[in-house]
Amino acid sequence: KELAAFVGKDEALCFSTGFTVNSGVIPALTDRNDYIICDDRDHASIVDGRRLSFSQQLKYKHNDMADLEKQLQKCNPDSVKLIIVDGVFSMEGDLANLPEIVRLKHKYNATIMVDEAHGLGVFGKQGRGVCDHFGLTHEIDLIMGTFSKSLASIGGFIAADSSIINWLRHNARTYIFSASNTP
């Protein structure tokens, strides 16, 4: 509860690593009729998570919001559209254009998941991440984070509303079939 409150969400679910968060959460949230839309420079754990899903996968050019919109236009309007983006891109060090991604979320009825692995502890008030930095925490559906960067520990988490966390608790295979975190 404290971790979820820190990043501005109802609940959080802890995993053994940050990598297992993305590789388990992404396939648990989508199925064959859904779309995953990712920045082409997203972290390897996001790439593997989308590969493990059976959803239709679309990539947009790095931080190119016109291309993101072009990819969203390809989606069936009645299907789930999950936009997944790094808050801070680990190789480039630049920030996702969250204000524009949120605008497109509303225009195309999409869901947003932000990987805060490199933003947590650095950006936002008291290190709450890039979502907080832009004042958009309430607009972001899922916030992922890791303990292995600024928090200097082991493990990862996903934070969202209670219904999403409950779904993931019972459907994210990397949570169900993995070892628990170290104390």
Per-range role (PLM):
Residues 1-24:
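Short loop-beta-helix segment that forms the pyridoxal 5′-phosphate
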Residues 25-44:
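Conserved PLP-anchoring active-site segment centered on the Schiff-base-forming lysine
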